[in-house]
């Protein structure tokens, strides 16, 4: 049996009772934290909560040695843990599908993810369009996909959730400041008037924690603002309903 369980967003207290129950029964627990990470806790605390040791797998082992994990689940009960919800990342979906192809029982335990946590903004979830990711620019690598996604969503009046790059192995987490700066750099190159320093955006910091940060304002006023510890994400609002306008006014710190 393969149990795919999410750990939630912030700390070990996000672990569900269902996950705790299955953790007691399984033979071995694996986890990956390269797609996302819980910044409010430590591996020791997670292991203490589950009362079992956890073997952490790096990107290469998850993406290129998936069969080893799946084959082990033929004869043993294996738990695979991820931050957020276990079925958000395409890689995790592939693991579940391949396991089922081999006749292995798959149990999926859902958990809070950024897609549920953005409800804290008061923006209507059904008005979000395609999600995009802003990555750290590298030499000869500066994808403009986020710009195109935002442009297409705005045409339809949709909000855009921009996830920010995580390089957990380097303990490097893109800040909202860096994400906004990247969007302005793409605009400077494309000149299609999708984003400007006058564009009003929302920033969510430490979603899922007891004290998340909610900030709203023009990009020019947010570029040098201290959003404090990660993880951050950026939302480019589309057409706003009056209730959403009230949410941005009263639920957010307006910069």
From Swiss-Prot:
Keywords: Methyltransferase, S-adenosyl-L-methionine, Transferase. InterPro entries: 4pyrrol_Mease (IPR000878), 4pyrrol_Methylase_sf (IPR035996), 4pyrrole_Mease_sub1 (IPR014777), 4pyrrole_Mease_sub2 (IPR014776), Dphthn_synthase (IPR004551). The keyword Isomerase does not apply. It catalyses: 2-[(3S)-amino-3-carboxypropyl]-L-histidyl-[translation elongation factor 2] + 3 S-adenosyl-L-methionine = diphthine-[translation elongation factor 2] + 3 S-adenosyl-L-homocysteine + 3 H(+). Gene3D superfamilies: Cobalt-precorrin-4 Transmethylase, Domain 1, Methyltransferase, Cobalt-precorrin-4 Transmethylase, Domain 2. One of its GO terms (biological process) is protein histidyl modification to diphthamide. Pathway: Protein modification; peptidyl-diphthamide biosynthesis. Its EC number is 2.1.1.98. GO terms for molecular function: diphthine synthase activity. Coiled coil: none annotated. It comes from the Archaea. It is an enzyme of class 2 (transferase). SUPFAM superfamilies: Tetrapyrrole methylase. S-adenosyl-L-methionine binds at residues 9, 85, 88, 113-114, 164, 207, 232. S-adenosyl-L-methionine-dependent methyltransferase that catalyzes the trimethylation of the amino group of the modified target histidine residue in translation elongation factor 2 (EF-2), to form an intermediate called diphthine. The three successive methylation reactions represent the second step of diphthamide biosynthesis. Homodimer. PANTHER family: DIPHTHINE METHYL ESTER SYNTHASE, DIPHTHINE SYNTHASE. Belongs to the diphthine synthase family. This is Diphthine synthase. The lineage of its organism: Archaea, Methanobacteriati, Methanobacteriota, Methanomada group, Methanococci.
